[in-house]
């Protein structure tokens, strides 16, 4: 292999490290021809865990490295949100057992097809743009904490030494989860989580409420926060928060919350641990 190609290989291996992946698209953009990539594979430098994506031979295929590759390497504004983000931040014992291992992604664009074909221990679920009208942010290493914070996002390490990922803060993740509530069992889950949300930041909650387009999500979030009498709720700035009009029937035969006009299951207390 010539000096130029050896240099290109070294750059690629440095980019990949032990846990990253690169797509065929990324390789084309960075001037790695199909024939050169095929040579790297046949020489034992690269492997393809799914069609259209490559990693270092002997590397570790882990969900953290995959998401980091999407966010920073591929430049896709997909963040870890909702249920899985809350689990990462210490609330996994409140989540339904079968959902703890599902990585929930949000963003304006669907992830590449190879993502669901990777042999990961976790399932990855794309839940669309989510309930917010916020503009997408580019998740480069140069993006500031303030830019992310204005979106209800933050860099988060899933474990010591793991890749840092862009995840929803608890304020945003709770509204994302409330938006996806479609049955009584999910209300029980969100209620248990809300009970634990004793340290949410009122200004951040207000910001997320103002940018949330889902009337259901906002009313459910506020009704459950009120039900658990969280001290921060009275400090949330409600100027510019649209809660819609009329009553919302979230569950059949439920009790109407007097302030936020949304029906909640009447047996919520019985389902709290």
Spans of features found by a protein language model:
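Phosphate-handling catalytic interfaces
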Residues: 91-273
């Amino acid at each position: 292999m010539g000096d130029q190609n050896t240099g290109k290989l070294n750059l690629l291996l440095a980019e990949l490290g032990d846990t990253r992946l690169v797509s065929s698209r990324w390789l084309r953009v960075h001037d790695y021809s199909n024939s050169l990539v095929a040579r790297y594979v046949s020489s034992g430098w690269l492997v393809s865990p799914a069609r259209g994506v490559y990693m270092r031979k002997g590397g570790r295929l882990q969900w953290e490295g995959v998401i980091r590759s999407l966010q920073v390497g591929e430049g896709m504004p997909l963040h870890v949100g909702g249920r899985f983000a809350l689990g990462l931040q210490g609330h996994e014992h409140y989540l339904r057992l079968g959902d703890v291992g599902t990585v929930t992604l949000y963003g304006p664009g669907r992830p590449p097809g190879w993502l669901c074909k990777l042999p990961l221990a976790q399932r990855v679920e794309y839940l669309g743009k989510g309930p917010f009208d916020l503009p997408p942010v580019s998740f480069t290493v140069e993006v500031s904490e303030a830019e992310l914070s204005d979106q209800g996002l933050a860099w988060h390490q899933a474990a010591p030494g793991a890749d840092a990922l862009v995840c929803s803060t608890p304020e945003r993740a709770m509204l994302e989860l409330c938006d996806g509530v479609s049955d009584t069992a999910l209300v029980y889950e969100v209620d248990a989580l809300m009970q634990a949300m004793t340290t949410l930041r009122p200004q951040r909650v207000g910001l997320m409420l103002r940018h949330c387009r889902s009337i259901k999500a906002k009313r459910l979030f506020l009704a459950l926060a009120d039900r658990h009498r969280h001290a921060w709720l009275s400090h949330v700035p409600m100027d510019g928060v649209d809660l819609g009009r009329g009553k919302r029937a979230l569950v059949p035969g439920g009790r109407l919350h007097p302030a936020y006009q949304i029906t909640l299951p009447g047996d919520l207390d019985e389902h709290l641990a």
